């Protein structure tokens, strides 16, 4: 029974005292029994949390009651239980690490497209659909005919822009998981001379909820315990291949060698054969972890105390 929810959200807005707000926000999450990861910066708020339906309802009311977050939109998905083991509420320089700290999405971004508008535009001849996510994300799922960027992290995006100059005459439709990366990516594209830039409001997750995920090939990589999520209920497919043998597989695993910890698709047969390792070298590594068939190795709680960083 899916009586829990996963919330995904972000909001670019000015937070005068991130440390004070972190304290308040952390306490509210503890009160409501939420787990997850929340980042607070002077430029805004970014989070993904899980909790009971009632806990999530009260949390959304709490956040939306703050005038700074009146424009914030929650993406809500039903789940069987918590999608996280811990709660982290942290202050960082940016709400998503981008190497674009000078870009202010509250001043200028690409035009926001609702999922229905994105669906109507994406296949036009004068349009290019641009995936602004990292390799490990788009290798397991992406929109049909999307242009992908060879980058290990979003902070590499500014250096990759020069490879996209040939697209400047097109309408560029950017997308990412929940919309947050597109805020700065689309703004930076405009800064670099791209004139007609759009972004999928709410990202792949909202598109899956509102449009059934049509033409999203493969699975959506998510940053919680699920790792990948089914978003396409219309014409689903598998596009990722096993890192070891090359057969189709959307089963994401971490290499059982913790020193490597490579995150790649691996079919069940290769998982058993390789004992969860991505190579023979990793299979023989003295620190190799026992493989239980999942390829997931949750971090030990090691005396985790959710009140550890609370000052009052």
UniProtKB/Swiss-Prot annotation:
Which keywords does this chain's UniProt record carry? Oxidoreductase, tRNA processing
Give an example GO biological process.
Answer: tRNA modification
Q: Which InterPro entries match?
A: Rhodanese-like_dom, Rhodanese-like_dom_sf, Rhodanese_C, TrhO, TRHO_N
Q: Name one GO molecular function term.
A: oxidoreductase activity, acting on paired donors, with incorporation or reduction of molecular oxygen
The reaction(s) annotated as catalysed by this protein in its Swiss-Prot or TrEMBL entry are:
uridine(34) in tRNA + AH2 + O2 = 5-hydroxyuridine(34) in tRNA + A + H2O
Any idea of its EC number? 1.14.-.-
Q: Briefly state the protein's biological role.
A: Catalyzes oxygen-dependent 5-hydroxyuridine (ho5U) modification at position 34 in tRNAs.
Q: What is this protein called?
A: tRNA uridine(34) hydroxylase
Name the source organism. Answer: Cytophaga hutchinsonii (strain ATCC 33406 / DSM 1761 / CIP 103989 / NBRC 15051 / NCIMB 9469 / D465)
Task: Supply the source organism's classification.
Answer: Bacteria, Pseudomonadati, Bacteroidota, Cytophagia, Cytophagales
């Amino acid at each position: 029974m899916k009586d829990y929810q996963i919330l995904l959200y972000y909001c670019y807005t000015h937070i005068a005292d991130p440390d004070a707000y972190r304290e308040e926000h952390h306490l509210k999450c503890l009160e409501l029994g939420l787990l997850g990861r929340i980042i607070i910066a002077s430029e805004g708020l970014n989070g993904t949390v899980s909790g009971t339906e009632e806990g999530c309802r009260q949390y959304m009311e709490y956040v939306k009651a703050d005038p700074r977050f009146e424009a914030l939109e929650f993406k809500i998905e039903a789940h069987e239980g918590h999608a996280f083991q811990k709660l982290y509420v942290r202050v960082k320089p940016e709400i998503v690490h981008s190497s674009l700290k000078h870009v202010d999405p509250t001043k200028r971004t690409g035009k926001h497209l609702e999922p229905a508008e994105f669906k109507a535009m994406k296949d036009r001849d004068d349009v290019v659909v641009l995936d602004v996510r990292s390799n490990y994300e788009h290798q397991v799922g992406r929109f049909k005919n999307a242009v992908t960027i060879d980058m290990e992290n979003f902070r590499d995006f500014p250096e990759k822009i020069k490879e996209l100059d040939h697209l400047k005459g097109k309408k560029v439709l950017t997308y990412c998981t929940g919309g947050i990366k597109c805020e700065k990516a689309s703004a930076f594209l405009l800064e670099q001379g791209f004139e007609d830039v759009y972004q999928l409001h709410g990202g792949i997750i909202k598109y899956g909820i509102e449009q059934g995920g049509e033409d999203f090939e493969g699975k959506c990589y998510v940053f919680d315990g699920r790792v990948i999520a089914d978003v396409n209920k219309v014409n689903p497919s598998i596009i990722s291949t096993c890192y070891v043998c090359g057969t189709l597989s959307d089963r994401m695993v971490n290499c059982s060698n913790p020193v490597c910890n490579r995150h790649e698709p691996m079919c069940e047969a290769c998982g058993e054969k390789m004992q969860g390792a991505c190579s023979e070298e990793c299979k023989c590594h003295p620190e190799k972890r026992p493989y239980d068939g999942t390829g997931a190795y949750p971090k030990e709680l090691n005396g985790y105390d959710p009140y550890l960083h609370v000052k009052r």
